[in-house]
Each structure stands twice: as C-alpha cells, then as structure tokens.
Amino acid sequence: MSEIKMELIVNLIWDNEAAVWVATSEDIPGLVLESGSLDALMERTRYAIPELMALNGIDSNKLSVCYRSERHEPVIA
C-alpha cells in the first residue's frame, strides 16, 4: 500500500518591477526566494523545501509539491 503524501503549494509570481520570479508558500513557513529565471527558482525551491520543513519538524519524505506560476503582461498591439 502506498503512503499518502501531503501536497504543498508553491506560488511562483513574476515581479515586473524587480524583473524576478518570486516563490512563496502558505504551506512552507519561511519560503521566500527569488530569481531572474523560472527554472532556476524551481531548482532553488527543491533544495530549500526539505531544509525549511526539517526546521519546522516535518518529514519531507512524505511531501509532494505543486508549482503554480503567474505572470501578467500587457498586450502589445
């Protein structure tokens, strides 16, 4: 029987003023990262999540992550 994993939501939002992607999560206390590259930011979160969860006393082996990205831009006519 497979173990049920808890799914964490990580929000990846483009900050147009700073020209960076920002990662935050209500499920992961302390997670605030930024990067100019979406791929690089996702890679950074993969390493940060287990560390932050361990600091909060949560076993990261029973977790999965759902990344949600959002970027708003004006339409160029």
Label for each model-derived stretch:
Residues 1-11, 39-77:
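Short, charged, surface-exposed hinge/linker loops at domain edges
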Residues 29-40:
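A short, exposed loop/beta-hairpin motif centered on an aromatic-Gly-Thr core
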